[in-house]
């Protein structure tokens, strides 16, 4: 039977992305991707439980991960042993590093040893014997011994029976803690079962009902006679690869109808009235359903049976079909793990800490766009995020790659970030792109943001834009940084000032906004170029050493909002050069569209630049 799955809420869409990723990883793309839905024959799901386990096994492969860590660590140990320095300080440092590295590799091995001890004494003993030899490694003559230890330990940990159990328990723990709790094979009581036995549990709990609906639908379409039906149902009941719900259905058909020699029409009537139910999530009327609860997705559900008082008339029923249940079970494969650096106040000190959160970008224009966008997020989230934020990088990529991008397309982007721990807490944050920001990206970013060459600065500006923070703080800070450099560069900060001006004007949503942006951009350019001109004249007179003092004073006056002090410095600069004050300052100070920060930052950006800088950029 063919089923169709349409784009829906963000968490359902993340399940669709996960479902497609699992199929793609297993080279069986049986689902057809249409504009806003996917479709496939449900009998193609017969091996999906194996695909699911393979996807997560390869993603969290403990044996491979441990092998790579051990090899890398032993390589460092060998390098320390082979170092032939004669300097006493260096020798002492090498010995300390060697001791640290040996402790590190022992901790890696010990972590797995403690788990292996519970279910394989022979493997545990083999690894433990080699583990105990690590501390005896002290000279370069022990290099061969190191290689032997490494070979034995990595070989033992990568044994199929060991690695499968270690990896299965790891990804079960992750899925249970962050997404589904203690349901199906994720329940800790199933840990004693083999990898293959737990695969079968998933088949029974998540796939068998979908397959059996095909068979039940065939009964409704008169594919079988009573005699054939009797044999088929008996085989299915004997096979025991079906869920308890379906066992009950087939038992009822067998005892109430077939054994009592009732007609096929009576069986069909029973199915229509008592078997099929309506799914509240996908609106499918031909399905077996179960109640939506925390076992379907912890961050957006509660234990319905235990919290009926929270529901109107204590009605906690929200039936969903088995196809939706399977799609939701694919959410972990559709979510990207994003590393973020957060600031925390610890005993009065600002401490930067790295943590992982779950991220998803909902973009419901099409399935293809949704998949591409989240695949890009997944790739960029693997980069060092102490510097870059994958969300900003994602939007930058969209803007730069899609020249004909429409505002509504950016407004449709909906970013979700969540952290969850089963039975502990759940935190979800959402943000989308405001209309004026979307207009900026579509109409103005090509000639502002995209021409900035300093990528880190660009990403910082993106972060401020998306979080609706005032760019004046980052511009002021950047200009101060430039003053401490040997080669100063103010052009990027001038572009940032233009971006800030445009955003402030776009917030007003004036009908003649384009003309106002153009007019005020021109004024900022005059201020920037005036600063460049003064820089060049002072440089020609060998008086450019005065610039830093002037600039710091002006930056301080901008930060404090002191226009009088700023203009005093401007006047002093002009007087020292024997020039009249440029009329542009009088004009812009009276302009209602231009704020003090934009005026000051544009002039300072030029003042610390030279006439070749823009060309170099």
Go through the PLM ranges and name each one:
Residues 301-483:
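Domain-exit/linker segments immediately C-terminal to small folded modules
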Residues 1-208, 406, 410-617:
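Long, contiguous all-alpha helical interaction modules
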Residues 189, 193-382:
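Basic, glycine-/proline-tolerant helical and adjacent loop/strand elements
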